[in-house]
Amino acid sequence: MLTDPGLRDELDRVAAAVGVRVVHLGGRHPVSRKTWSAAAAVVLDHAAADRCGRLALPRRTHVSVLTGTEAATATWAAAITVGAQHVLRMPEQEGELVRELAEAAESARDDGICGAVVAVIGGRGGAGASLFAVALAQAAADALLVDLDPWAGGIDLLVGGETAPGLRWPDLALQGGRLNWSAVRAALPRPRGISVLSGTRRGYELDAGPVDAVIDAGRRGGVTVVCDLPRRLTDATQAALDAADLVVLVSPCDVRACAAAATMAPVLTAINPNLGLVVRGPSPGGLRAAEVADVAGVPLLASMRAQPRLAEQLEHGGLRLRRRSVLASAARRVLGVLPRAGSGRHGRAA
């Protein structure tokens, strides 16, 4: 709701750059509560803010007041009354308006686009959980692979991305909050088309806030988020388990691994009951995958025999899965259990 032609032109130009549609409402068409609440963002001038403030409209997010000059005291008062989060002088603060409309458009898409989150953890050390997490990420149409084991040397080594430019966990100065997925994606390395947030070759610790923020950004971006978890139940690990649509417990097919899976399963289900088992061969004593699942008390999602020459491949450029490989087939079966991402809609500014 802008009466100044110059401010209207500024808004139209910024909105076109962001990719949102603007609906202009003038003084002859007072805003209704429905229109006020339905728009992805509301942009007002001083007069419109004063008018909407007198209507006692409900408080909402993404309300901005634009001015062409230094904001007067009366403008700030009108902005506070209407519940605006920003008072922006144009064109000097155009960048802030761009960010505000982009965030509003992304928020409007949240209900339509929602990626799935899968957390992968080993029943015991050396179970192959990290490898299976990489296989899931490679088998997904678009994935974010999140390394949550700060003492494992970096999952980027498993995808051949150790020299790829981009941020790793220690590079992120992040406490939590809401992140823009496009910005996250642009900052991360993408070896073989997978966005990877990896650890490094030096130790560090992870807090729950940044982990939750990164997972949430990927989910809102509509990608499949694959979290590789350590067997230590830290706050960061529990944040990923809480956020997961599916927790995958990976176990070798031997007696000791079977016992370890049975020990780990109730701990995991107490945090997230959506737990399934993947059993990896070989089976030196003839134990069957279904028997491991019965002992662990966990539904069997997939089983697979040992993949030949896997260790050699990992030493020379990381995991590269052929579509018909046993790892890829098992990964597709697990991905088939996840909820499908919806389709989004474009945001609208009023």
Swiss-Prot record:
Disrupted gene: phenotype observed:
Essential for growth.
Mind listing the GO molecular function terms for this protein? ATP binding; ATP hydrolysis activity
Q: Which SUPFAM superfamilies match?
A: P-loop containing nucleoside triphosphate hydrolases
Cystine bridges = none
Q: What induces it?
A: Induced by albendazole and thiabendazole, which inhibit the GTPase activity of FtsZ and probably septum formation.
GO CC aspect terms: cytoplasmic side of plasma membrane; cytosol
Q: Entry's NCBIfam families?
A: CpaE_hom_Actino (TIGR03815)
Protein task? May play a role in septum formation.
Q: PANTHER family recorded for this chain? A: SEPTUM SITE DETERMINING PROTEIN (PTHR43384:SF11), SEPTUM SITE-DETERMINING PROTEIN MIND HOMOLOG, CHLOROPLASTIC-RELATED (PTHR43384)
Other remarks on this protein: Was identified as a high-confidence drug target.
Tell me the protein's name: Uncharacterized protein Rv3660c
Source organism: Mycobacterium tuberculosis (strain ATCC 25618 / H37Rv)
